[in-house]
Regions:
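Conserved binding/recognition cores within well-folded domains
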Residues: 1-81
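Eukaryotic intrinsically disordered, low-complexity regulatory linkers and tails enriched in Ser/Thr/Pro
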Residues: 84-86, 90-95
Length: 95
């Protein structure tokens, strides 16, 4: 067991019944599903961007959208990009 500070979290990714927390330093497995995390995370800091992904808004470097309406999130502290499904793109249109 290790303590991860909220500010260090880049995003959460669903992994079957669990969630993986991703930080700049690596990753850790949580024994909670994504839907339970949504109930306890601060909605001002964390937003669901896909059915399997919750992102820390402070960790976002940029958000882009293609011609089909699909979005992509580029992170400040991680090399991967995250897909934003169309239903969740409305969150960013209103920001």
């Amino acid at each position: 067991t290790r303590l991860i500070m909220v500010d260090d979290i880049a995003y959460f990714q669903a992994d079957n019944k669990y969630a993986v927390v991703m930080t700049a330093e690596g990753e850790a497995l949580l024994r909670k599903p994504i839907r339970e995390l949504l109930d306890v995370l601060d909605p001002a800091l964390f937003k669901q961007i896909h059915r399997s992904t919750i992102v820390n808004l402070k960790a976002i470097a940029s958000i882009t959208r293609d011609d089909t309406g699909k979005g992509t999130v580029k992170l400040k502290s991680r090399p991967e990009t995250l897909a934003v499904s169309q239903p969740f793109m409305t969150l960013f249109r209103n920001m």
